[in-house]
Amino acid sequence: MNRTMARAQAMKLVYEWEMGGNGGEETRFDLLGVQPGEEESDYMEALFEGVIRNIEGIDQQIARCAHGWSIERINRVDLAVLRVAVYELAYCKLPAAATIAASLEVADKYSTEKSVAFINGVLGTIARGEKA
């Protein structure tokens, strides 16, 4: 598993958590087919746990930069992609362009073309430090 796959798996965990699941060990390893202890599975776990720990601040950033979209209105898959990406932008000290590109790759696989454009706009606004 590479980092993009780790992001996709983290997005799935965040989505499952949002839909009422617990993102527990069974989901993380058995259902996703991820092996514990691998560098990327550790990264996936760090992303998931970081998003959950910082969910309020992450959602505030998304809501502020989503140009008229409330958190409740955003598609749940798109929201999961955004949450993981915003966590990476804020806490992982990775280049913003790389984080955004990888997040768009995940969105392209799991969401719609319009969603990719929306996610790109929100993440670009956040990366530039702008407000809606």
Residue ranges and their predicted role:
Residues M1-V116, N120-A132:
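N-terminal interaction/assembly modules
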